[in-house]
A protein has these predicted regions:
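Hydrophobic transmembrane alpha-helical segments in integral membrane proteins
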Residues: 4-32, 175-183
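N-terminal signal-anchor/start-transfer transmembrane helix
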Residues: 28-44, 193-197
Length: 211
């Protein structure tokens, strides 16, 4: 369902909200969990490290969405809606990890930060889904101004990667290559998710174990 066209001022406001969504993602879905991953590795906090490792496996779908949107592939808009939902679920789903985190002293900086981050990530997921859902109409009409707003950040990241790739390898990192890698990664992601849903979940339930 395509979003109704808005006046120029509202289109500018919509673009601002899109960029706000990307900035929130960079903070709560990328930057902070990366810091927590390194922090937990340095402190050798096994439960936190395992939670963050599982989170990054799930969060890779957001990177796949960026690759697909770089080349304006319609599927990227759908995965952009699904990704934050799975990411938020991944930090609350595991019963054993939840219990281990509850046992950690609240006054310690790392456990406290992880707990606050999980709530912040959940809030971001709600905002992100609400925003990305408005772009589902772009799966049929990707050339509108609203759709182009969602493509700006992926194309900006693509430009940086293209420059680095050319400098290091002397090759071309094109939008078509990015989309191809995105599709290949998506196939692997879906295969892994199905394997977990059909094989591992029925056997172990909500226990992370050594996953």
């Amino acid at each position: 369902m395509t979003r109704l066209r808005l006046p120029a001022v509202n289109e500018l406001s919509y673009r601002t909200l899109v960029w706000l969504t990307y900035r929130l993602a960079a903070t709560f879905a990328l930057g902070l969990p990366l810091v927590l991953l390194v922090w937990s590795a340095l402190r050798r906090e096994a439960s936190v490290l395992r939670l963050l490792t599982l989170y990054w496996k799930v969060a890779s779908l957001m990177g796949i969405s960026m690759l697909l949107l770089t080349d304006q592939r319609p599927l990227g808009y759908l995965t952009a809606v699904i990704a934050p939902l799975l990411m938020a679920c991944s930090v609350w789903f595991w019963v054993d990890l939840n219990e281990e985190l509850e046992d950690l002293p609240l006054w310690r900086p790392l456990p406290l930060t992880v707990r606050l981050w999980r709530w912040a990530l959940s809030g971001f997921a709600i905002v992100s889904v609400a925003m990305t859902a408005t772009a589902l109409g772009c799966m049929q009409q990707s050339g509108s101004m609203d759709c182009l707003a969602w493509q700006e950040a992926p194309k900006g990241v693509h430009s940086v990667v293209e420059t680095v790739f050319d400098f290091l390898f002397g090759g071309q990192w094109t939008e078509a290559v990015a989309a191809f890698i995105g599709y290949a990664a998506l196939v692997a992601y879906v295969a892994g998710l199905l394997q977990w849903l059909l094989v591992r979940l029925p056997r172990q339930g909500r226990v992370a174990g050594g996953f």
